[in-house]
Amino acid sequence: MANTETVLKDAMTSIDGVIGVALVDYTSGMALGTLGGGKELDLNVAAAGNTDVVRAKARTMELLGLKDEIEDILITLGGQYHLIRLLKGRGKSGLFLYLALDKSRANLAMARHQLKRIENDLEV
């Protein structure tokens, strides 16, 4: 099992094309940890904004009567992928991993696979 800092470093080094990664508490909208980003990508702003995305999707599913769980949410921009993976398991409720990827260098299927592995390694 790995702590927040370790899994963020793992994401930055094991996933091709990563621009930044964050562990986010979507009950508060606060990033519990961030790595990467920069002036073009403020990960704390992204954490708060993507919290709204997660809440909106959960609310929509409730209104539709869908009895399922969100695994991940993909937002595709012109030059980037933004991947949000909701975490499951003891101590992980209310958390998501947020990953921003350079579209020209990333392999989306592998990024999703690696995020799932990283989720399993994370101990909160």
Explain the meaning of each model-derived region.
Residues 1-124:
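Non-catalytic interaction/Regulatory regions outside core domains
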